[in-house]
Structure formats: C-alpha cells, structure tokens
Amino acid sequence: MHNDNSRYRGLFGFVVRRPRLILAAALILSLISVLYTWKTMTFLTSRVDLMPKNTQFHTDYRAWRQDFGDMEDIVVVIEAEDQELAGRFGLELHARLALKPEIIRELFFPFGLDFFRRNGLLFMPVADLQSLRDNLLLAKPVLRELAAAPSVQTLFSTLTGQMERYLAAPSAAGAERDLVGISFMLTSLGSGIRQFGESGAASFSLQEVFFRGKDGKESALARAGKMQILTALPVRSEGSFVPAELAISLIRTEIDSLKKRPEFKGVTVGLTGVPVLEHEEMATSDRDVKTATALSLVLTVILLLVAFRGLRNVAAAMIALVIAICLSFGFATLTVGRLNILSAVFAVMLIGIGIEYGIQVVLRSQEELARGADPLDAIAAGLNRNIWGIVMAAATVAAAFLTFTLTDFKGVSELGIIAAGGVAICVLVTFTVLPALLVLFMPGNGAQEAGAGKGMKPLSGSALQCPAVLGQFLFGHPKRVIALAIILCIASLFPLSRIGFDYNLLNLQAKGLESVTYAYKLMKSKENSGYFAVVVADSAADAEAKARRLESLPTVDHVVSLNSFVPDRQPEKIALLHSLRRDLSDVQPKPYSEDLQLMELPEVFERFRTTVARLKAELDRGKRNEAVPVGEFLKTLDAFFARLEKNRNSNALGMLRDFQGGMLAELPEKLKLLMATLEPSPVSSADVPQELVKRFKGKSGKYLLQVAPRNEIFDREPLEAFLRDVRSVDPHATGEPVMVYESMTIMRDAYRGAFLYALAAIVAILLVAFRSVKFAVIGLVPLLVGLLFMVAGMWVFGISFNPANIIVMPLVLGIAVDSGIYLINRYRNEGEPAEVVVTSSTGVGVFLNTLTIMASFGALMVAHHQGVFSIGVVMSLGMVACQVAFVVVLPAVLKLVEGR
C-alpha cells in the first residue's frame, strides 16, 4: 500500500513532503552556528562584569579602580622557616618574571625593597624591640664566639664553658642572668636539632631565636618574614576563557624550576588572588561541564534505548537534540555574545529539557502504531496531538527563564535570554527536524510497507504496566494519597524555614585547590591579609583620622595606608637600636669554614652531654623551673647522638656536615645583616619608595586605606558586621569584600524575584491555556508538592542553597508545571480516566522526561567544582520530588475530581 503524502496538511504536511530539505537546512544552520560560536563567543570570568553597573557600590568600585589602577594581582605566597631563604627565593622569582613584561605587567615584592631591609626593625613595637635586645644580650657570649669561628665545636664548647662556670658558683653575682642565657640558648639549639631530625636540615634562624617576646611568641616581623608575598599584575587576554592563564602558567613554571634547586630546600610556595581563583574556577567548571555534558548524552541515549526499544527512534531524537543544542549556541552568540560562569551550564540544561518534547512525540507515535495506525499517520498523530501541550509546557519553562531578564544581575539576565531562546529552538526542532528524521528513518522512506511492524516498534496495550497492589493504592484511595501528601507538605514547612543560603564563594570551588587553601591562609595571617576593604581619604591628615577611627572598631584588625610606612616612636626606637649595636660591637662575623675537626668532636660532644646532665641534676636539686626545659633539651640531644651512632659506619660524617652547614653556614651573613639594621636613620614620608606611593596614592592625589578584618569574613554574618563597621566611617567603602557582599545580595534577590515572576507568569499561562480556574489550580499541585519535597530533601541531606544551585529554583518551577500540563491536557482532551492517563504514552513520557532531566543534571555530580556539583544534587532532588508529585499526587487529585 502506498501512502498519499498529499493528504497531510499543515506543519506535518510540509515536513512529510520535504524531509531531506528540512534536515539539510538544519545541518547547514547547525554547522554555521558552531563555526560562528567558535570564532565569536567570548567568556566573562570576572564576577564584577556580571553585576549591575548603575548601583552605588559599583560606582564606588569603578572610581577606586580608575584612580588607583587594577589591583587584581596574582598573589604568590612564599613560606620558609628562614626569612632570608624565603626572601632569596622571592628575589630570584621577581628577577625571572621581570623578564616577561608582555605577560606580567607589574611586580611588587616588599622584601626586595631596600627600604624595608634597612628600616624593618623600626616597624616593630617598642616592646618587641626590647625583647629582641634582651634575647640578643642573653645570646651575646655564644654569638661572639660563633661569629669568630662558626662551627659545631665552637657552639658546643662555648655552651659547655658557660654551664661549667655556672655550676662552679651557682650563687655568685650574675649567676642568675647566666642561667637565663644558658636556658635560652639550649632551648634554641634544641629547636634546631629537632628540625634537623624532622627534615634533615637545620637552620640557626635569627628570627626563630631572637625575634620572640617574653611570652615566647614570635613577633609580627618574624611571622611576616616566614610568609612573604610577591604580587604580579597579569596582562589579561580579554575575551579569553581564562584571561590570566599565560601569567599563571609562567609563574608556576618558574616556581617549579626554582624549587628544584637545592639551595631552596624547605621553601613552600602557593598561588592565590582573584585572577587565580577565577582561573581555577573557570578551568575546573569548564572541564566539569564538558565531562557532564558527555555523560549526560550517554545516559540520555541509554534511557531512550530502554524507552523506545529501537535504534532508529533514539537516533532521530538524539540527532534532533544535538541540532537544537548547536542552533542554541548560535543563538546565544548572536544575542548575548558571551558566556559566564552561570550560563556556561545551559547546554546541560537543554539536554534534559530539550529531549522531553521529542519523547512525547515519539511515544505517542508508538502508541498510535500499537493501535494499528499507518506509520505516517502515527507520526502525524504524535506531532499534532502534542503540539498544544508542548507549546504550553515550553511556554512555562521559557517564562521561568525569561523572568531572569527582569533582574538587575547581568549574569542571571543573560542566562535567562540564552536558556529561553534555547527552549524555543528545541520546540522548533521538535516540530520540524524530528518528524523529518522519523519519516526518513522509516523503511523505504515511508513510501512502502505501511504496516506497523516495519517502522517504529509499537507500545502494546497500556504503555506502562502498573502492579495491581500499587495501582489499587494510587488510584483506588485518592483521598488517602492526598491526605498523606498534605501531611508531608505540612511537615516540609519546617525544613523550608530552616534551609540556609551559603554566601561563601570559596565553598563553590573544588575541594583542595591551592588557591583556596592560600586564600584562607592569608585571611588568618594578621601580617599579610590579602582580603581587605578599601577606604579612600582626601589627604594624609584625613587618612590618619580615618585610620584611627577604623582601628577602634571591633571588627577591624588594622589599617594599612601610606602613613603606615612612616614608623611611630622613632626617636625611642632608634636610640634603643643604636644602644644595642654598641653592646654588640665585639660580635665580629668571620667567614664560615666547613672544617669539622673530626678528631676533637667525640670529646666535645661527650663533655657537652655530661655538663648538660650535671646542670639538669643541679637544677632538680634546687627545684628550679629551668630544670624542665633543660631536661627536654637533654632528651633531644640524646636522640640526636643516637642517630649519629646508628649511622656511625655509613653516613654519620654526612649528617654532621649537613647539621653544621644548615645551622651555621649562613650565620655570618645573617649577623652582618642584623648589624646593619641596628643603625637606622629617621624615616619621613619623603623616604617611602615610589613603589609604595604608587599603590597607596591615586592619580587624583587621594590616599588609599586597606582595612583588614579581625576575623574571617568569607561567611555572610561576619562579613556583614565588618562592612557595617567600615561603612560607619566611610559609606563609600569598596574593595573585594564589598563587591562580594553586594553581588551575593543582588543575586539572591534576583533569583527570589525571578521565582515570583515565574510563578505569576505560569499561573497566567495555566489560566489562559486551560480556561479553567479548577484545572489551573490542579496544574499547580506538582509545583507546590515538588518544591516542598525538594527543600525537605535538601534539609535532610544537609544541603544549603548557594549562588550556583539557586539557579535551579525557577527551572524546577517550570518543569514541575510543564509535565503536569501533558497529563492534564490528555485527561481533558481525550476523556480517559486518571489511571489510564498516567500509564499511557503521555504518562510514560512524563516519567521518562523526569528521568532524562535527572540524568542530565545528575551528570553534574561528577564535577569537582562544588557549585556545579550542587546544581546536579539540587536538581536531582527536585526531579525525584516532582516525579512523586506526577506519579502519585497528581493522579490522585485527577481521580478525585473525575465526574465533577
């Protein structure tokens, strides 16, 4: 029997007569779209670019950047127990990076400035300088001997002599002070020996030994020396997916090269800063989305193979879907022209959303085949009887997305345009390309063998066989089902009131990222805080006044401004340091020699160990407090000697050489540097280097104040308190914390607004489409039940909303309604009972739609990026909740209203 294609009218008539033309046109347009996207699409990686431009906080931010320049530096954190070692690493890295001005626009390394090396001690509090003086004077007897002959023999012999003099006359004048000095040096030496035992390298660190207060804690200067900061301003490749990639790659390459050098053993280095955080976020999310997209397609194919029971229909549906996605990319490029961290996931969205329209068409066609329809008639029925339902369903989803455009947040608005356009394209492809493919994939191209067995595999009987017991519960007791659903919905109100919003952007990053680890480390560092608010002052006097007010606030730790580089109490500090220099005038460093004098060492060690034991016994007899640290040192010393004895015939000489070299090789140079810093001159504002002036004084002559928080401010409550305090001094305060706080607030409000707009639009669509208040209300049942159950599931699993996963709320709203529309339309138009509707091809289609959406978004759970991962989790929970609403609650409601 031959088919008469001329009998088909309307859209399907056009498709059935020109399937090859439609497919060819679609493929050509898809290719053009892909090429156009490849050549033209750009990426916004900065969150600043996603924010509204007309707000006061954004105006303040732009004014600061315009006056003081780009300060989004790559931050290199260099750590070492020895300040000089960290400094040398930084200087070498600075020199290498300075050779690449086409990649690194500007470098800043405070340790490399002679200003700080010469005047660093003047920035210490007077109390810390007094502790430094006391410590140096306690160590002076040993330092004097070590400076003249830096060796293990000198160190141990000098300490032995000091202990013997004390033991000879413990009650003599000055003996108490000698004991304090001995205890101090033994404790310091013990620290070096333990470090050697742990890492195989010892270092007689002046910072470790001398820069400690009377409470034993390190001074701020010592802590800052152990963690040094180099900043690099990258040359950005605008429009690139990762604009600072070249600079970050260069810096990491140079760091890896330097760390391989033996002289930099013990140095650890990490990168952070806004460019690095954005680079790693975009790179991670890009990899994750690509992986998730591929996995989503695979899972969708598997689901379709199970549902369609044949390759031809699956191939037709997937080809149509891929064409729709390609065309959607072209639409996104043409209308918006760029992607951002939010809109980058729209391809995954379209896989789940776009395939549902094709599922309805194919399953209805199979159902018609099962009833004995001609294959072309079956395809026509699958298309024509779903047109209105698909249009309504797509309208609800598109409306949910279009409400994004009513918000002030550019990133959200752009996603709304792209996704709504993508939904419209998916519908257009479903109505044209998909039926064309179904026609072309028929045996004989639809011209021969019109029987059902030769084309699609038909669905026999009811599309979904429901077990009798389950069917009796679902459809035999609708009131019980509805009562149970109401109870669960009421119970879900408690989780709804408890679900939180996580404002911490670092929690969106992949776990274990170096940039995140170092961002937290800098936040906890009082000396090197890399996360601060910015206040601008009109003059130096205004800056000083604002700094005093800011530092009096409970949430502010300290303020750094140009005035901070002129030390306070200079006459007092200079007098103290000059006096100390005179006291140490007989400490004259001589060059280091590696001569171990092996023949003398056993006797020197034995005498030293015996004297320490005698001192411990004497202190125990006198019940002196110093007995405890001396006893701890004796244990450390015995462990060290035991290691030497163990390696006596293999590597004892190497161990001793390493120990002496690590402990004393750099001591002469360090002593010279220390002596130089003990002779500072008065510092005035005119002495501050231009590198610092440039960073803290703008083009307009205004002064910059960096306001460091007292506590971590990555979470909303401490951040809000900090900004409230800072803004009490200057309402126009800006900086990264302000931008994060305001952008997260705007994003949260934008999604809330979009949700309400979408709800209003969907109610309007339901009223217009159904022309019935009753069925419009019924259409809202899956939405309300699904949302409440989803939030309850999030609460049970400890999942909070965040700036990434909140994107799914309007989406769940649209999907919850559109699937209900299919069921209600069939129920009303074909007069079938609720149980038949749910188990028909339409019901199977809704079930399969939900599974494919769950699969496409669930694929995001393979992501390392926690924001992308959370989108997958929340959307999957939403689809499970909606599935319960479709399969259980909605049929019960329809059953209850039957005949009314």
Give the role of each language-model region.
Residues 110-118, 563-575, 738-744:
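Short proline/glycine- and acidic-rich turn/helix-capping motifs at secondary-structure junctions
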Residues 164-310, 613-758:
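Extracytoplasmic
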Residues 118-134, 467, 570-586, 746-756:
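Short, low-order "capping/linker" segments at domain edges
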Residues 573-639:
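Charged, amphipathic alpha-helical linkers/stalks
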Residues 2-294:
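Membrane-proximal extracytoplasmic
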Residues 102-103, 555-558:
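Glycine-centered tight turns that cap/initiate beta-strands
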Residues 37-81, 88, 203-219, 471-480, ...:
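Solvent-exposed, non-transmembrane loop/terminal regulatory segments of multi-pass membrane proteins
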Residues 1-48, 56-63, 236-242, 246-508, ...:
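Membrane-embedded transmembrane helical bundles of large multi-pass transporters/channels
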